[in-house]
From Swiss-Prot:
Function recorded in the entry: Small GTP-binding protein which cycles between an inactive GDP-bound and an active GTP-bound form, and the rate of cycling is regulated by guanine nucleotide exchange factors (GEF) and GTPase-activating proteins (GAP). Required for normal cytokinesis and cilia signaling. Requires assistance from GTPase-activating proteins (GAPs) like RP2 and PDE6D, in order to cycle between inactive GDP-bound and active GTP-bound forms. Required for targeting proteins to the cilium, including myristoylated NPHP3 and prenylated INPP5E.
Annotated protein name in UniProt: ADP-ribosylation factor-like protein 3
Record-stated family: Belongs to the small GTPase superfamily. Arf family.
Pfam families cross-referenced by the UniProt entry: Arf
UniProt-listed PROSITE patterns: ARF (PS51417)
Gene coding for it: ARL3
One of the record's GO cellular component terms: midbody
Keywords annotated in UniProt: Cell cycle, Cell division, Cell projection, Cytoplasm, Cytoskeleton, Golgi apparatus, GTP-binding, Lipoprotein, Membrane, Myristate, Nucleotide-binding, Nucleus, Phosphoprotein, Protein transport, Transport
Recorded topology in the membrane: Peripheral membrane protein
Amino acid sequence: MGLLSILRKLKSAPDQEVRILLLGLDNAGKTTLLKQLASEDISHITPTQGFNIKSVQSQGFKLNVWDIGGQRKIRPYWKNYFENTDILELAELLEEEKLSCVPVLIFANKQDLLTAAPASEIAEGLNLHTIRDRVWQIQSCSALTGEGVQDGMNWVCKNVNAKKK
């Protein structure tokens, strides 16, 4: 197969689309994380009123990342976004029936701060070791510096691929 044939095949094969919900409490760094994934400027972040959506290419996937506001008044509306979700980011939503068997990625964000709890401590506090109905990962990261963010997205792509097979 020549180079031209390979390029045509790659161009004709559409990226598999994956929907990711980015949920968390207000001021957790969700929007910063989203902008970091999209390689956008993170110097001016304001609280999300409603939601933001960005599409990011990664490992043959088109990742449609939904950043849903975390303020108390918005949280009751989170359920409206659950349909067709491929990856879940917030451990508190494990009990939701619509999300059963959906892989869970928990970003232990703000690891650039001296006061940040280590990922192992967060995993223990959330009793993640008791999760048996799905795969899960806790990923140390700093949305501000970008450290650990791509590692988390690599895990997402690997596990969505496994789930879709």
